[in-house]
């Protein structure tokens, strides 16, 4: 072996060379990962927003469990498409595919409005309170339910040309244009926080659906709260508990939805309480208890708003 080769070998084995190599490799890896994060971050945020909006519209029954638009026609839910010309949902005349990101964004822009309410059920727009909806909802999610004022919620406007361009302030002044309400639901499952939505008809009592966009429950057990087969039983349930005679005192009755252990029919039969109960998930009792508590705690502060919508619906029916 030549002297030059020996010197080169010694150089490679020197500590400073090894340290320099490791530092250089670490720097390269750090720059590479930072670049990848910078490039992918907007895409990830867009995907998260798309999923959250889908879950919201699923809870409001605007989307079916296959992610397709649907519309109520003669008291039946039928497939629908978002007509680019009329900017409205129309009964589908051919096979409907899953909603795309642009379609969902366009529908949300036209017919979904974030609003605020207080303990008296008065409704405000975010513009009136000079608040940013995105920042406010993020902050609200991090707080215990009902610990923040004012309270946020969403509304789905009626599928008409009259409502598509209404601002939040316009809607707050004319709640008769509201088709459905969507409430943020937060609580704790077995393994951590759970966050989702509950959709309610404009009668302030009848459930349209539920969806969870964040949960870390056990796959095959507690995670089944995101299973369509479990979620579909929420449709038509009542969030205000009826008494034994079948009447509802909205001001004093219990408010929420109870996930029972076992089946509703076996546990409650045909009693009025069954209208506000959901079948439990086998092997996921603690998750189900957390879900029940999430509905009770999250909805409690919206009681007066729900009562106001119930009264509004009654007035509309009386005036017809």
From Swiss-Prot:
Principal location: membrane
Superkingdom field: Bacteria
First-tier enzyme category under EC: translocase
Reactions the enzyme catalyzes: a ubiquinone + n Na(+)(in) + NADH + H(+) = a ubiquinol + n Na(+)(out) + NAD(+)
Transmembrane regions: 16-36
EC number: 7.2.1.1
A Gene Ontology biological process term: sodium ion transport
Membrane topology reported for the UniProt record: Single-pass membrane protein
InterPro entries in UniProt: FMN-bd, NqrC
UniProt modified residues of type FMN phosphoryl threonine: 285
Keyword Lyase found: no
Keywords, ordered alphabetically: Cell inner membrane, Cell membrane, Flavoprotein, FMN, Ion transport, Membrane, NAD, Phosphoprotein, Sodium, Sodium transport, Translocase, Transmembrane, Transmembrane helix, Transport, Ubiquinone
Single GO molecular function: FMN binding
Cofactor(s) it depends on: FMN
Compartments where located: Cell inner membrane
Known function: NQR complex catalyzes the reduction of ubiquinone-1 to ubiquinol by two successive reactions, coupled with the transport of Na(+) ions from the cytoplasm to the periplasm. NqrA to NqrE are probably involved in the second step, the conversion of ubisemiquinone to ubiquinol.
Recorded family membership: Belongs to the NqrC family.
Subunit-structure text: Composed of six subunits; NqrA, NqrB, NqrC, NqrD, NqrE and NqrF.
Protein name: Na(+)-translocating NADH-quinone reductase subunit C
């Amino acid at each position: 072996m030549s002297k030059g080769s020996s010197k080169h070998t010694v150089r490679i084995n020197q500590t400073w060379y090894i340290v320099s190599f490791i530092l250089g490799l670490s720097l390269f890896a750090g720059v590479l990962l930072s670049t990848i994060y910078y490039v992918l971050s907007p895409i990830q945020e867009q995907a998260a927003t798309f999923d959250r909006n889908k879950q919201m519209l699923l809870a409001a029954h605007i989307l079916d469990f296959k992610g397709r638009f649907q519309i109520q026609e003669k008291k039946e839910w039928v497939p629908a498409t978002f007509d680019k010309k009329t900017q409205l949902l129309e009964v589908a005349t051919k096979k409907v595919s899953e909603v795309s990101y642009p379609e969902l964004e366009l529908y949300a822009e036209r017919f979904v409005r974030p609003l605020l309410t207080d303990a008296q059920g008065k409704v405000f727009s975010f513009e009136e309170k000079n608040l940013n909806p995105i920042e406010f909802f993020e902050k609200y999610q991090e707080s215990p339910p009902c610990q923040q004022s004012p309270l946020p919620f969403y509304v789905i406007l009626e599928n008409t040309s009259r409502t598509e361009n209404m601002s939040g302030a316009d809607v707050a002044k004319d709640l008769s244009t509201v088709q459905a309400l969507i409430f943020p639901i937060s609580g704790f499952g077995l393994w951590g926080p759970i966050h989702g939505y509950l959709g309610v008809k404009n009668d302030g009592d009848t459930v349209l659906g539920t969806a969870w966009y964040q949960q870390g429950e056990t796959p095959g057990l507690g995670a089944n709260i995101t299973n369509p087969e479990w979620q579909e039983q929420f449709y038509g349930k009542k969030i205000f508990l009826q008494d034994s005679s079948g009447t509802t005192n909205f001001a004093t009755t219990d408010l929420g939805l109870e996930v029972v252990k076992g089946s509703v029919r076996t546990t409650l039969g045909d009693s009025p309480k069954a209208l506000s109960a959901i079948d439990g998930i086998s092997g996921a009792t603690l998750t189900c208890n957390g879900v029940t508590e999430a509905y009770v705690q999250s909805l409690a502060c919206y009681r007066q708003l729900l009562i106001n919508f119930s009264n509004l619906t009654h007035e509309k029916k009386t005036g017809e």
